[in-house]
Amino acid sequence: MATLGTGMRCLKSCVFVLNIICLLCSLVLIGAGAYVEVKFSQYGDNLHKVWQAAPIAIIVVGVIILIVSFLGCCGAIKENVCMLYMYAFFLIILLIAELAAAIVAVVYKDRIDSEIDALMTGALDKPTPEITEFMDLIQSSFHCCGAKGPQDYGPNIPASCRGETTVYHEGCVPVFGAFLKRNLVIVACVAFGVCFFQLLSIVIACCLGRQIKEYENV
């Protein structure tokens, strides 16, 4: 095989550097997914079951990106056309999955308030020890009371709805909903950022693979 020219060595270096960036991005993705997963899981098992799918999916995608990026690094170092094309193919699959997950997170964000409202209203109508503990944790953490306000409890306002001197007047639906939205936006932004670097990697890896194939035929 002929020696790669300066331009192709530059492409090879670009693929390697972009894969290092993708490796780092995958760690950020895993970290962001884990952070959101831990945050959501702190506020009760019922809520966790509703929201756990998005952060877990992001963590899984991050791990896959880590493996695929390693494949890309090996393909660039070994100048292996098959590995480079496999790498590009897997990146395309991941890119589609990440874009779908990020779009779902952004779209689903608008349904958070209605779902939290239904969850908390139902919880207050049929309280159990677990639900009471869940509401107490939300109320004391976010300085809110009930689903829509302290009137949800009538005269029996719990201690978790009280500060040092006053009762919390804001309902927990908008406050806790805003918390969930912020965390979903974090996941979506990280996913979109990773997609940008992956798209660059796909284009450059395909260019490098084509050029290596041409040099092999010289």
UniProtKB/Swiss-Prot annotation:
CDD domains named in the record: tetraspanin_LEL
A Gene Ontology cellular-component term: plasma membrane
Subcellular location: Membrane
SUPFAM superfamilies: Tetraspanin
Positions in the Cytoplasmic compartment: 1-12, 72-82, 206-218
Keyword terms: Membrane, Transmembrane, Transmembrane helix
Extracellular membrane side: 37-55, 109-183
Membrane topology, as annotated: Multi-pass membrane protein
Disulfide bond positions: none
Transmembrane regions listed in the UniProt entry: 13-36, 56-71, 83-108, 184-205
InterPro entries xref list: Tetraspanin/Peripherin, Tetraspanin_animals, Tetraspanin_CS, Tetraspanin_EC2_sf
Listed PANTHER family: TETRASPANIN, TETRASPANIN 26A, ISOFORM B-RELATED
Family the UniProt entry places it in: Belongs to the tetraspanin (TM4SF) family.
Protein name according to UniProt: 23 kDa integral membrane protein
